[in-house]
A protein has these predicted regions:
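N-terminal cationic and glycine-rich segments that engage phosphates or anionic surfaces
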Residues: 1-104, 108-471
């Protein structure tokens, strides 16, 4: 990382403009998170939902990924979930339908058309999710006897329109960051959602840590600290694990396979051109954080459907089971989901999560890394890999290398995604105090990966805008 170059690039007006655009959009996003949905008495409903979050694992998870949007019962409650789901649908269809595959390979024009269709599909998905969320929350709040009013048809229509508009605004803000700022807009907004929950989680952890009802910590017989002794050692162990995960994530994100590209000499008149060497870096995890986001979004849908059916039919045991199985197990909801301790059902979500992360890593890499296109470009430019024939042979060679890299990268990413499940389980077994989902798990994985990717893009743009200084 060239920090001196980044500091020097801040003198460039375009660089400053892009940075301020990103910061301004993220501030606007956080302001939107505090605009309530117009559903009856907004304050009463907000207080009732906040009370529900502390009791329900499902609503707690929604609150995390919406950046506190649920606790505020804000217009961005639905978030980017419809847009992500729509993206998954079209990326799957582009591999299954030949005409869509041709369109996706038709350069910028084709990609722009598919992006437009993705946005259009996201709108009805946002409407459906808005209706589902409002119904689930209303039924849950009413059943907990914290609210006693019946929404009118006008309340329903206005609330659904408002939440759908909030999701569309988020989608637009994400695209603004991608086009006019730095980094991937969708990833940045999800990053900001998770980061915004860190202060409240750390505050809750600190409050529990200094709760000395169970005695204070006697350190080596000569120092007594006013902290919960069990929770102190659990927190310390988790802190060490988090540091190790951070270190491993950084190493994995920086790992790459370097392939040397040779360029043939060309004689033009009395001058010779080419004959130089270049490199083609192949990252161990080319897909970045996208597989994790896709896997989380994919697994949240069955939980939403199960919760919706349970709200409509209280006695539906199957719907309740589906909702529990597809709810991410963590320290805060472990004893609610598994009061009798760990059983075979506990392994279903982590196993599916691991499998989806691996599959989406392969799938997304095949989309963003087109070996045939790279091989064709190299052949047109007179480039070749030593010992490999240009053209289809080069494409097959690159495909073989990427398959091997993906095997290790996908397994490593999946394994890291599994570590928080284990640490949360250990934490709840040793202490009744929940550590909080946002301290680890998917949140940590997304935060680290997005931060590294954006630092890399910031570094690249800084080198580009300061290039003239090196001439």
């Amino acid at each position: 990382m060239h920090f001196k170059t980044i500091l020097k690039s801040l003198k460039n007006k375009d660089m400053l403009k892009r940075i301020f655009i990103v910061l301004g959009i993220l501030v606007a996003y956080r302001l939107l998170a505090h605009i309530p949905v117009p559903m009856g008495d907004a304050k009463t409903f907000k207080d009732a939902v906040s009370s529900l979050i502390s009791k329900s694992d499902f609503t707690g998870f929604i609150n995390l990924i919406s950046g506190g949007g649920l606790a505020s019962f804000s217009i961005i409650l639905v978030g980017l979930s419809p847009y992500i789901t729509s993206s998954i649908v079209f990326q799957l269809l582009s591999k299954a339908i030949p005409s869509l595959e041709e369109l996706s390979e038709d350069g910028e024009t084709g990609r722009r058309k598919i992006n437009q269709w993705t946005r259009m599909l996201a709108v009805p998905l946002a409407v459906v999710q808005s209706i589902a969320y409002i119904y689930i929350l209303y039924q849950s709040v009413v059943s907990s006897n914290t609210l006693s009013f019946t929404p009118t048809p006008r309340d329903w229509v206005v609330s659904v329109i408002t939440m759908t508009a909030g999701s569309i605004i988020l989608m637009w803000l994400g695209e603004l960051i991608t086009e006019q700022g730095i980094g991937n807009g969708t990833s940045m907004i999800i990053f900001a959602s998770i980061i915004s929950q860190f202060p409240s989680t750390l505050g809750s952890l600190g409050q529990q840590l200094f709760d000395i009802k169970n005695g204070s910590l006697n350190l080596f017989g000569w120092l007594e600290l006013p902290v919960n002794p069990v929770l102190f050692w659990v927190a310390l162990a988790l802190f060490v694990v988090v540091i190790l995960i951070l270190y491993w994530l950084v190493k994995l994100n920086e790992a790459q396979r370097i392939i040397t590209i040779n360029y043939a000499k060309r004689i033009h008149g009395n001058s010779a051109y080419g004959g130089i060497k270049s490199i083609l870096p192949l990252k161990l995890i080319s897909a970045g954080v996208v597989p994790v986001i896709f896997a989380t979004a994919f697994l949240s849908l069955p939980a939403l459907v199960g919760q919706l059916i349970s709200s409509m039919d209280k006695g539906n045991a199957m719907a309740k089971t589906i909702s529990e199985i597809f709810t991410m197990p963590n320290a805060s909801n472990f004893k609610t989901l598994y009061p009798n301790g760990i059983n075979e059902r506990w392994f279903i979500y982590p196993a599916l999560y691991f499998l989806l992360v691996v599959l989406f890593t392969y799938f997304y890499t095949s989309i963003i890394f087109n070996t045939k296109e790279i091989a064709d470009n190299l052949q047109k430019q007179g480039g070749f890999i030593e010992g490999v024939r240009p053209g289809i042979t080069t494409a097959n060679y690159l495909e073989k290398v990427m398959t091997r890299l993906n095997l290790f990268g996908a397994l490593a990413l999946g394994f890291i995604a599994m570590i928080p499940f284990i640490t949360d389980y250990v934490a709840i077994m040793l202490s009744d105090a929940p550590m909080g989902l946002s301290l680890s798990g998917t949140g940590l994985l997304i935060v680290v990966t997005v931060a590294l990717e954006n630092l890399r893009q910031l570094d690249s743009r800084a080198l580009m805008v300061t290039y003239d200084d090196y001439k």
